[in-house]
Amino acid sequence: MLRRALLCACVGVMAAGAAAETTRTLRAQLSGDPAAPFVVENLAGAMTVVAGDGDAVVAVATVHADDAALADAMRFEQVRNENGVPVLRVIYPLDRERTIRYEADGGDRHHGHRHHGLEWLFGSWDGTEVKYDGHRVRVSSSSGARLFADIEVRVPRRALSATFKNHVGELSAEGIEGRILLDTGRGGITARRLKGEIKADTGSGEVLAEDVTGSFSCDTGSGECNVTGFDGTELSCDTGSGEVRIRRAKADLIVADTGSGRIVVEQADAGEFRGDTGSGGIDAELTGTRLRRVKADTGSGHVSLRIPADASFEVFADQGSGSLHCGFADATAVKDDHKTVGYRRGDGKVRIAIDTGSGGATVDPAR
């Protein structure tokens, strides 16, 4: 009964808060050539970028505020940054509001990420300080005036040179191409069906990429990096803390690096693979005929490699503790003072280097 009463009380507060909220719609259109570099920037909220039907960059912001006065103080304008690049920027009344409140609905209004979850709603996230539009401002989930903007950006269906910067909140892009930077200070990033030179950078949050072609780099201070479906030259995933998962990737080079977390690679056709984790295992399935070089390094964790059944290879392992096992029956063991430190098969075309501080290693034929 107490649990039900608490739940009803929470729902009542949420409904009351939602009823008090004022919304307003702002529209901005980029002047000048959309093929030239440009930026779209927001302080707090969710940002969605999609391909439109026209030849202009058009952004619509839905402002959410505690009252009409705050909502009316918001603007959406084109300015220039310190490098002279045009910026479509949501202008907040930061001369009088030094702390604003942003409450994402269950962690995300648009994309279904897990990494914020209910921490936003119930206040376990206590805020972050941001430099924005010449001001220092604090964005919190529990204090300050409610004030944020959810943005939808529509861009031409051709190559762009664009940065989409969302300081606090989720950022998603779908069906666009060019030289693209997706950047959040705190919030997850989703990239679907992108083409070109694509970079996703978040200080804290999960990065999810699907069906990307060209080159893709993911950098997150804390959070998972998940890539499913890649075809291009280079794929790089780097996280300070969190798992890296790559599936169905074709690339000349795949790099996966995490300070703490597992690296899992499935159905990867790569010329070269480099995996490095401070704490956590590496499990990589490397298929295809282009494979030439593998480097797997873990401070603590097991390394499991699966390579083509017909591969000629040479593998050497430097292990603080743990043993090396090879599942190729016709491979020749390389000994050092009665200890197996490597294996050789055929002409050794694929060079494999394994380094573990603590943990075993296996090299097996892929099924």
What is the predicted function of each stretch?
Residues 1-367:
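Intrinsically disordered, low-complexity terminal regions
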